[in-house]
């Protein structure tokens, strides 16, 4: 894994004790080597979903992503990967059910996390004491942004894209789109939900992600329900 900035950590390098901290972890799924022992960590439902994927590459990436997710959550919590119980809340958002005592977590504290992937890249955002949502997209140079902007964005954001210069259009589109997705995932609602709206004084913050991995440009957004110590640029 690569350390991109203050809230993107190397695996096993940073402690996770500050309840205001948020970490984002990246990996290239095509470079992840999974063995039978690691695959045994996965739940029956995870194996069943993998079996339904007919495309071998998609299946390999899915399994690698599930193993990587458990590795990160195990590193953060100190709980063995095979003992982690990933559940879904009432809105269907994945979350981690923790025992009352963990090596790095005090009693009754719930770790929040969110996962996003694009092509062969996957990222995980982890946080304590606040909801978090993350979304990333690999930039597609051949995408007709003006043609699809009005179907993906609300009126105000679409107008910003339509009026943007050619040089800034692609980055702006992906920033706006991933921001909306990350916010929806933080809330646990769909991106078209009425809950996804603007407010001038939100009890949440948005951070931008821009990085290059394996010669690909990745744009993303991180939505955090409360102010954190994460160091990143704002939109």
Spans of model-derived segments:
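Core catalytic alpha/beta fold that binds nucleotide/phospho-ligands
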Residues: 1-235
